[in-house]
């Protein structure tokens, strides 16, 4: 009897596992089939080219999920890079193939016949996608722009007026961004004359043994008052306890549900930090966002800057802090993913207000995750100059 009950349960688990395995291959199949259909088959290119392109698309459709999984397990090397690169390429091909239907419609209305219409559309889509990917790769891997912004803070003391908070976030040091890239970022940071330098999470994608040499240059970054680090969700995929310990060994203060106080004479500013919202379910003992603990013992009446990786953490901080600094969204990174991000987060990038007291600054991030492209979502290093609130503002 027990065996009879166990067999259906075992079959149910097998079916669930099969479905989980099938979904990535189904998605990959759609991403490859649509461009092949509209860019190769519909334009009636020579039969040999159509068949060859179809065979390549089929191999890539099956290979992409395998590359992504094997590359993630390996962590370094060609396999770790190949999957994300091709994912970015085929995603943009898929998106702009769909968008190309508008051009196809315009050409049809203006009387352009097929197969000329289909071929013109295919060439336009391929050319536009190639140019966009080249620009997106430069945006992701090239120089990181500095974005400066003044933020008016209620109750900021006159001695703290003009305090410079420099934010770097979502560096995602992995198979693409080398130690040289980190060194270049640190050189930029040192030129920005930070009073408070913060990293708001998602430092790396990988274990300490594989990535420490890429992170090490952050130990040379300088700031007048403090260098502060908080966890993002990716720390909990990569060994949060190891990475927080390593950042402390580099001289950074890790704010895990606690705060520091920046003083100029008798004027004070509280800078608090909390764990990422995923920390409590990560399985890492003692980790979990706790704003009450972060603010415990803070000087009464002093303005508060909160470091919280995800913008949506502002919902628990409204009217308890004056300014929250977050990352996580990457500004969408690959258009049109930004629209999906907005379903989960209150904002994509920039400064926003939440309640009468609280402002939120969301950085687009300094690095990138996955595909080494940034399409309509440039990276940034944010320089926020804190100013006393204007009368009546």
PLM segments and residue spans:
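Non-catalytic terminal accessory segments
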Residues: 1-142
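Juxtamembrane/interfacial segments around transmembrane helices
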Residues: 102-111, 137-148, 171-187, 217
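Canonical alpha-helical transmembrane segment with a positive-inside/aromatic-interface signature
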Residues: 116-161, 165-167, 173-178
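Soluble catalytic domains of enzymes that build or remodel membrane lipids, polysaccharides, and related
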Residues: 152-393
């Amino acid at each position: 009897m027990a065996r009879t009950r166990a067999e259906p349960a075992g079959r149910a688990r097998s079916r669930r596992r099969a479905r989980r395995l099938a979904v990535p291959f189904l998605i990959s199949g759609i991403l490859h089939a649509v461009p092949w259909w509209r860019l190769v088959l519909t334009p009636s290119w020579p039969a040999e080219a159509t068949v060859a392109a179809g065979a390549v698309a089929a191999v890539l459709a099956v290979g992409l999920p395998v590359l992504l999984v094997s590359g993630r397990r390996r962590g370094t090397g060609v396999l770790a890079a190949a999957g994300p690169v091709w994912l970015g390429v085929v995603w943009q091909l898929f998106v702009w193939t769909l968008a190309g239907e508008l051009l196809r419609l315009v050409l049809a209305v203006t009387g352009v016949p097929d197969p000329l219409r289909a071929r013109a559309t295919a060439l336009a889509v391929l050319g536009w996608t190639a140019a966009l990917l080249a620009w997106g790769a430069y945006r992701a891997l090239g120089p990181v722009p500095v974005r400066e912004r003044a933020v008016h803070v209620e109750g900021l003391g006159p001695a703290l007026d003009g305090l410079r908070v420099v934010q770097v976030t979502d560096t995602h040091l992995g198979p693409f961004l080398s130690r040289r890239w980190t060194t270049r970022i640190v050189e930029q940071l040192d030129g920005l004359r930070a009073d408070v330098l913060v990293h708001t999470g998602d430092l790396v994608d990988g274990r300490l043994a594989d990535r420490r040499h890429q992170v090490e240059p952050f130990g040379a970054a300088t700031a007048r008052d403090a260098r502060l680090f908080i966890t993002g969700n990716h720390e909990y995929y990569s060994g949060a306890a190891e990475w927080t310990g390593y950042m402390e060994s580099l001289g950074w203060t890790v704010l895990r549900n606690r705060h520091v106080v920046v003083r100029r004479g008798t004027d004070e500013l509280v800078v608090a930090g909390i764990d990422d919202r995923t920390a409590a379910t990560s399985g890492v003992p003692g980790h979990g966002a706790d704003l009450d603990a972060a603010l415990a013992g803070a000087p009464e009446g002093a303005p508060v800057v909160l470091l919280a990786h995800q913008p949506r953490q502002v919902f628990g901080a409204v009217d308890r802090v004056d300014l929250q600094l977050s990352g996580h969204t990457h500004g969408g990174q690959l258009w049109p993913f930004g629209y999906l991000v907005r379903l989960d987060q209150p904002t994509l990038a920039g400064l926003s207000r939440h309640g009468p007291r609280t402002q939120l600054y969301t950085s687009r991030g300094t690095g990138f995750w996955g595909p080494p492209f940034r399409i309509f979502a440039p990276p940034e290093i944010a320089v926020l100059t804190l100013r006393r609130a204007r009368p009546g503002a």
